[in-house]
């Protein structure tokens, strides 16, 4: 009964509670006054990579003394001192005592900027909304059913108070992803979205990501592996555990700042690894299926299967890859004999608005020389018993999730991400890998005349000229690769800037669109509900 009351209250708040002129924001210069709370990740600092006239140059920072704070301040200092397009942020730091209570008492701004700490994001956002602050988070806003309910309440309270609670999603602004979504909505070209089956989903997302990133620590040339879902910098060819050159001719090389393949994980621990990696993928899937439409998660999402399992990393491989003499204390809880059993792998199959969907996340140890590569054979990890750890080197396409593997370059070196949408007339496959620009491949349905299909594809791309002019195609096996002009590509800082600008627009509006709220809740319901249920069982 309590749950029903909460949901009804939230639904009531989301439906029509917005009133004209409810926002104090007008778009005036410097009116958005940032409060940075407990910084911990790169994306948070990237929000300040460029000056925005709507954001006040004085930023108040509340955080405990430590590496997270110092790393954030170092990045801001780098932005302020770079030779070109230098910023002029004035950072006012408070790092003593109970920083959260002090911030809530002083409230020296109107927008709280939260960083990548999944464990605390829900509590921080609830406290800020309760204190009358808008919230922009670079961290997933919920992990576990209690935090999901807290997010529901916070969104309802934000709407009641005329505040905006929003999660930064720069992945939405990648041009290849936008083109994939646009083509999927072109019924004449794509046809209807096929439904698939539990055994063979029609929408498939697969990710193979590093469990750690190698970072230089302080002095000398020693390296240390830091736990979390972080990836090698895009320009770091030595970080490719397969030993293959990232500048493969099948891919366009990405600029160094295009995508750092990192997640805000240093302070998260490994327990939220699957959620952190899967959240942006599910966000893209929802946009592909629904566009900017509302989702009723308790009606339009049903779960087929879900499991999380650890990656088994031999301790000797960790020590060799990290150059460490001994296992750090943070990893001791994951030690089993001479093997580290590190959480983060997982597979989720569910039905989204009638479409069977599969999401797979797997991890590897960079520097071990045994990263998994994409193949069409089922993975050992996919068929292992649930109580058995899968080797971090297990390779292959997850069993049954073969949509998007036909007709595109195979044997992709890790890290890589793939998102495939199977339609009546074509399959749209977005492929990303570290060090290369994301590519969009279009595979015609079986029996389709290739020449006519190419003409149809060019016509469909021509209709997207307002979104991206100058698109072309080139054959790639039995598929066609969409050739995207270089000027249409944006680096990660620019995508973060676009996401932040969208948030500022919502501040002026006074509330986010209903579809944003619905899709945020649907995303976390998808990420949390099936795994909580499986643990209870």
Task: Label each PLM-derived region with a short phrase.
Residues 281, 345, 367-378, 399, ...:
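C-terminal helical cap and adjacent loop that interface with cofactors, partners, or active-site loops
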Residues 217-228, 234, 251-373, 409-413:
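Rossmann-like dinucleotide-binding domain that binds NAD(P)(H)
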Residues 142-223, 227, 234, 243-257, ...:
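A contiguous active-site-proximal alpha/beta segment in oxidoreductase catalytic domains
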Residues 8-10, 17-133, 148, 152-160, ...:
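N-terminal glycine-/serine-/threonine-rich beta1-alpha1-beta2 phosphate-ribose binding loop
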